[in-house]
Amino acid sequence: MPIITLPDGNQRQFDNTTSIMEIAADIGPGLAKACIAGRVDGQLVDACDPIEKDANIAIITAKDDQGLEILRHSCAHLLGHAIKQLYPNAKMAIGPTIENGFYYDIDLDVTINDDELAKIAKRMNELVKTNYTVVKEKVSVEEAKALFKERGESYKLEILEGIHPDDRPGLYHHEEYIDMCRGPHVPVMKFCQYFKLMKVSGAYWRGNSDNKMLQRIYGTAWADKKQLNAYLKRLEEAAKRDHRKIGKQLDLYHMQEEAPGMVFWHSNGWTIYRELEKYVREQTEAYDYQEVKAPQILDRALWEKSGHWGKYKDNMFCTSSENRDYAIKPMNCPGHLQIFNQGLKSYRDLPLRMAEFGSCHRNEPSGSLHGLMRVRAFTQDDAHIFCTEEQILDEVSACIQMVFECYKTFGFDDIAVKLSTRPDQRVGDDATWDKAEAALANALTTNNINYGVLPGEGAFYGPKIEFTLYDCLGRGWQCGTIQLDFSMPGRLDASFVGEDNERHTPVMIHRAILGSLERFIGILTEEYAGVYPTWLSPKQVVVMNITDKQSAFVDEVVNKLKKSGIRAISDLRNEKIGFKIREHTLKRVPYLLVIGDQEVEAGEVAVRTRKGDDLGKFKVDDFAAYIKEEIITRR
């Protein structure tokens, strides 16, 4: 006779074994119709799973985040069901959920184009309308192997090879289609009606390029039509803001096959890059950092000693010379430790703050590369602080303050903070990790920062604070990090002389604000839709004549603005002024100056903004002062 405790503390007693669905029905028919799954003593379960003893339970509906995750996972099974009906020879690989949706990897001889995708979606809709019941079955590993061998599902068999023989995999029956999963899943298919198949791409089995290339079908799914339409609308807006599209329109950069994942910066894009670099440099100087520069290529022995070789060698570009192995740096910390190690350090030298615009390379899979957002060559606004344990709180607090100040400059005020704790693969003992995690948690609490915890997501050498920016479309971008490291300084022989005249190992704080300059420019481009604030705009002013008679004065104005440090250009083409204004507005130039005979006579410029506002006429020096103030204050 299990006693069930609900989230509000109310209890219900059942005569026999019960289930989440029976409990929902006991509460009310409306809840039973909405029930997707449940939690029993904190564990996710299917709505049909038996509950045989006293338990604390919660009923999950599509309104819950976990409910949305479950229905998306069930949509992946629905996709598999439709594919097997349409293409019986297809072999199904994996179908997990992802942010906002799901995908399924399929081994299929037929190339899935737009027409095939529409056919699959149509069959999925037909299956949903039948509202069939999903039946769960727990079997032995051997029974599962026999089933999938009979069905010719070689990828499922390979997955089963990695499952412990004593486990009992879950099989979910979608009528004649059977899929294998931990679950939970929706009880009936009506919950999966608000979906859309989005695209098809290639994906190597298990992400290994030595394996067969499969076809990956992506989809999105939501609790109701309103949510689905809102998401599709956001995608439309995101497509308009795509930094790759805007980058081409504004002539910022390009990428090409001869250098995959590496950016060719054009003059306009490089101007933005240098302005970001200038801004970060001002901040590091204000916070008393020393700027340094370490080599890009270091001996393999150093990477082995630091621990990076064992963790990252597959993602490192390597080379050799004169019988020595080298690697291009994927990160900057070992180089900064070598600088710290030059000369004897005293406790009086600490904290020592070291910053670098570090050029890094990582051998990311080619399929994961995406414009500026995922590259192989990038520059980190990296810094490392060497300090004593007693200085950790003050130094981490200063880093937190610096991060928030920088993000505010760019207009980001919706920032999520997470504390990432020890991963399974790590260096250092548990006592050291306990101390490091507690130190970061203390700094966050002291600074009144609300934060969540990401178990197991820390770096291999220490826990970290992660800062995720949310843009105007509600998308999250993880950028800044503050990582505490008690391990690497000791591994690389860093030490200082303490007040007791003994040698001690410093604590190392790894800190980045933008993350990588390339990716942050991509984020800003999409956030601003290319309408950068004046201080970041590649061209800040365009000066245009109405007729050839004003050309000399246009040149005079441009030269005067340039001498004031303003990025100004002229447009002396023999085109109508309206045409010029439209063209430079599309190029997102912040200020458009028009000069006719009256302006020449008065020594003035007529000022318009890219928004179409007419600011009236200014003396040239007055306009220069006006825009300079905007640039200096970074408004």
From Swiss-Prot:
<dbReference type="InterPro" id="IPR012675">
    <property type="entry name" value="Beta-grasp_dom_sf"/>
</dbReference>
<dbReference type="GO" id="GO:0006435">
    <property type="term" value="P:threonyl-tRNA aminoacylation"/>
</dbReference>
<keyword id="KW-0648">Protein biosynthesis</keyword>
<keyword id="KW-0479">Metal-binding</keyword>
<dbReference type="GO" id="GO:0005524">
    <property type="term" value="F:ATP binding"/>
</dbReference>
<dbReference type="InterPro" id="IPR012947">
    <property type="entry name" value="tRNA_SAD"/>
</dbReference>
<feature type="domain" description="TGS">
    <location>
        <begin position="1"/>
        <end position="61"/>
    </location>
</feature>
<comment type="function">
    <text>Catalyzes the attachment of threonine to tRNA(Thr) in a two-step reaction: L-threonine is first activated by ATP to form Thr-AMP and then transferred to the acceptor end of tRNA(Thr). Also edits incorrectly charged L-seryl-tRNA(Thr).</text>
</comment>
<keyword id="KW-0067">ATP-binding</keyword>
<dbReference type="Pfam" id="PF02824">
    <property type="entry name" value="TGS"/>
</dbReference>
<keyword id="KW-0820">tRNA-binding</keyword>
<comment type="subunit">
    <text>Homodimer.</text>
</comment>
<feature type="binding site">
    <location>
        <position position="510"/>
    </location>
    <ligand>
        <name>Zn(2+)</name>
    </ligand>
</feature>
<feature type="binding site">
    <location>
        <position position="384"/>
    </location>
    <ligand>
        <name>Zn(2+)</name>
    </ligand>
</feature>
<dbReference type="InterPro" id="IPR006195">
    <property type="entry name" value="aa-tRNA-synth_II"/>
</dbReference>
<comment type="similarity">
    <text>Belongs to the class-II aminoacyl-tRNA synthetase family.</text>
</comment>
<dbReference type="InterPro" id="IPR012676">
    <property type="entry name" value="TGS-like"/>
</dbReference>
<dbReference type="InterPro" id="IPR045864">
    <property type="entry name" value="aa-tRNA-synth_II/BPL/LPL"/>
</dbReference>
<dbReference type="GO" id="GO:0005829">
    <property type="term" value="C:cytosol"/>
</dbReference>
<dbReference type="Pfam" id="PF07973">
    <property type="entry name" value="tRNA_SAD"/>
</dbReference>
<dbReference type="GO" id="GO:0046872">
    <property type="term" value="F:metal ion binding"/>
</dbReference>
<keyword id="KW-0694">RNA-binding</keyword>
<dbReference type="InterPro" id="IPR004154">
    <property type="entry name" value="Anticodon-bd"/>
</dbReference>
<dbReference type="GO" id="GO:0000049">
    <property type="term" value="F:tRNA binding"/>
</dbReference>
<keyword id="KW-0963">Cytoplasm</keyword>
<dbReference type="InterPro" id="IPR036621">
    <property type="entry name" value="Anticodon-bd_dom_sf"/>
</dbReference>
<protein>
    <recommendedName>
        <fullName>Threonine--tRNA ligase</fullName>
        <ecNumber>6.1.1.3</ecNumber>
    </recommendedName>
</protein>
<keyword id="KW-0436">Ligase</keyword>
<dbReference type="Pfam" id="PF00587">
    <property type="entry name" value="tRNA-synt_2b"/>
</dbReference>
<dbReference type="InterPro" id="IPR002320">
    <property type="entry name" value="Thr-tRNA-ligase_IIa"/>
</dbReference>
<feature type="binding site">
    <location>
        <position position="333"/>
    </location>
    <ligand>
        <name>Zn(2+)</name>
    </ligand>
</feature>
<feature type="region of interest" description="Catalytic">
    <location>
        <begin position="242"/>
        <end position="533"/>
    </location>
</feature>
<dbReference type="InterPro" id="IPR047246">
    <property type="entry name" value="ThrRS_anticodon"/>
</dbReference>
<dbReference type="Pfam" id="PF03129">
    <property type="entry name" value="HGTP_anticodon"/>
</dbReference>
<keyword id="KW-0547">Nucleotide-binding</keyword>
<dbReference type="InterPro" id="IPR002314">
    <property type="entry name" value="aa-tRNA-synt_IIb"/>
</dbReference>
<dbReference type="InterPro" id="IPR033728">
    <property type="entry name" value="ThrRS_core"/>
</dbReference>
<dbReference type="InterPro" id="IPR004095">
    <property type="entry name" value="TGS"/>
</dbReference>
<keyword id="KW-0030">Aminoacyl-tRNA synthetase</keyword>
<dbReference type="GO" id="GO:0004829">
    <property type="term" value="F:threonine-tRNA ligase activity"/>
</dbReference>
<dbReference type="InterPro" id="IPR018163">
    <property type="entry name" value="Thr/Ala-tRNA-synth_IIc_edit"/>
</dbReference>
<keyword id="KW-0862">Zinc</keyword>
